[in-house]
Amino acid sequence: MKRKNLLKILVLFILAGSIVNAEYLKENGEIYYEMPYFEVKSKVKEADAKSFKSFEGRNKTVMDSYYGKDNKNVYLLGKKLKNVSPKEFEILNEDYIKDDKNIYKVKLEEALFFSSNEINTKKISVDGLDVKTFRTLENDKEIETNYFGDKNSVYYIYENIDKIKEADRNSFKILDYYIAKDKNN
């Protein structure tokens, strides 16, 4: 577990340090993903320039600027995310994304290899979780948090998506990154 967390931290440092100026570009009716640090500029295969949208500038998660979508596909670091629909696509945090039907875990380590044009995702299923209403819980501090909720329950995401069984969805309030309260606790 410690090794896995260390690897994840290392990957995030590499991404943050070396792809800090990376961006999607529209040129001559084509979409490109540019990483100036590596002096790499590659065409995003199958991307539709007319409907393409980058998530850069959204500033909800560290990963926002690495994602883009068009009317057919979702892309991470210029590579197509396999089986992810652009319909209602949302970046939940560094490891998890969702579309209109499913929640997925993204293998960030896989995204760093430049040999493939597609990135595999792992579909996540949690008993009772309503994907349509699953969202990041709002907080007064405007901090990125690992607390999420659907219409009925509260969840905490770290390595997995865990339901907080005794949490009251209606009174749940985030106090800080790891600290929250509800009427029961």
Task: Tell where the protein language model's regions lie, with residue ranges.
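Sec-dependent signal peptide recognition
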Residues: 4-12
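Hydrophobic h-region of N-terminal signal peptides that target proteins for export
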Residues: 12-20
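Non-catalytic tandem-repeat scaffold regions and their flanking low-complexity/translocation tails
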Residues: 19-185
